C-alpha cells in the first residue's frame, strides 16, 4: 500500500511540474517572440523595420495565443514526463525553440541563426539517449546533406531558391538531436505533411502552383511528432 501511495505521489508530482512548466512555456513563448531583438528577424545586412524595433509592438497577440500555447505545452509535457522526466526536459526545450522558429518563419520568412544555435546546444541533452555520439553527428550531416541536395536540385531545375539556408541549418540541428533514424523520419514526414497542406491550399485556390510556403512550421510538426510519440519506437524495419 505504501509503495502505491509513493508511486502515486511521484506521478502527481510529475504532472504538477509538467503543468507549471507548460504554462510558463506557453506564456514565455509569446513574451519572448514579442521581445526578440529585431535584428534576429532580418536578413544579413537588412535594417529592422520600425515594427521590429518598437518594444511595445505585439508581433503576435497575447490572447488567445498564450492560452493555446500553454494548453499545448501542458499536454505534451505530461506525455513526455510520464515516459522519462530526463528526456522530457531536453525535448520540451526543443519544442519551445521550434515554436519560436515557426513563428519567425511564418510571420517574417526568417529562420534566426541564434535560435538554431540554441537548438544545436540542446543536442547535448540527448547524448544519453543515443547509443553513440556518432549517431548524432551522422544525423546532423545527413540532415544537412539531404536539404542541401534538394536546394541544389531546386535551384538548377526551377532556376530559383526552393529551400533557404535557414531550413538547411535547422535540419542539421535536428539531426544532431534525433540521430540518423530520427532525421530520416523527420525528413519524410516533413515532405508528406507539407505536400498534403500545399495540395489542400491549392485545391482551395489559396495558393498558386508557383508559390512557396514557409517550411519551418511543417518541419516543427514532423519533429514534434517524432520526439513526443515515436522516439522510442524501433524503425529498424524501415531503415
Task: List the predicted regions and their residue ranges.
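A membrane-topology feature that recognizes alpha-helical transmembrane segments
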Residues: 2-239
Amino acid at each position: 500500500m505504501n509503495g502505491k501511495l509513493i508511486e502515486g505521489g511521484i506521478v502527481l508530482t510529475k504532472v504538477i511540474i509538467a503543468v507549471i512548466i507548460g504554462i510558463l512555456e506557453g506564456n514565455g513563448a509569446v513574451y519572448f517572440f514579442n521581445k526578440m531583438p529585431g535584428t534576429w528577424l532580418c536578413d544579413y545586412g537588412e535594417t529592422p523595420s520600425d515594427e521590429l524595433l518598437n518594444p511595445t509592438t505585439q508581433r503576435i497577440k497575447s490572447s488567445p495565443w498564450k492560452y493555446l500555447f500553454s494548453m499545448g505545452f501542458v499536454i505534451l509535457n505530461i506525455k513526455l514526463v510520464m515516459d522519462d522526466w530526463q528526456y522530457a526536459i531536453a525535448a520540451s526545450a526543443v519544442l519551445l525553440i521550434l515554436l519560436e522558429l515557426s513563428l519567425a518563419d511564418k510571420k517574417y520568412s526568417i529562420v534566426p541563426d541564434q535560435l538554431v544555435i540554441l537548438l544545436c546546444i540542446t543536442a547535448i541533452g540527448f547524448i544519453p539517449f543515443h547509443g553513440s555520439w556518432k549517431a548524432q553527428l551522422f544525423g546532423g550531416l545527413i540532415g544537412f546533406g539531404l536539404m542541401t541536395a534538394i536546394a541544389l536540385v531546386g535551384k538548377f531545375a526551377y532556376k530559383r531558391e526552393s529551400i533557404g539556408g535557414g531550413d538547411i541549418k535547422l535540419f542539421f540541428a535536428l539531426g544532431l538531436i534525433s540521430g540518423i533514424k530520427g532525421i530520416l523520419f523527420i525528413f519524410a514526414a516533413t515532405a508528406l505533411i507539407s505536400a498534403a497542406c500545399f495540395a489542400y491550399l491549392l485545391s482551395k485556390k489559396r495558393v498558386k502552383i508557383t508559390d512557396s510556403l514557409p517550411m519551418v512550421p511543417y518541419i516543427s510538426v514532423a519533429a514534434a511528432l517524432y520526439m513526443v510519440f515515436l522516439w522510442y519506437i524501433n524503425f529498424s524495419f524501415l531503415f
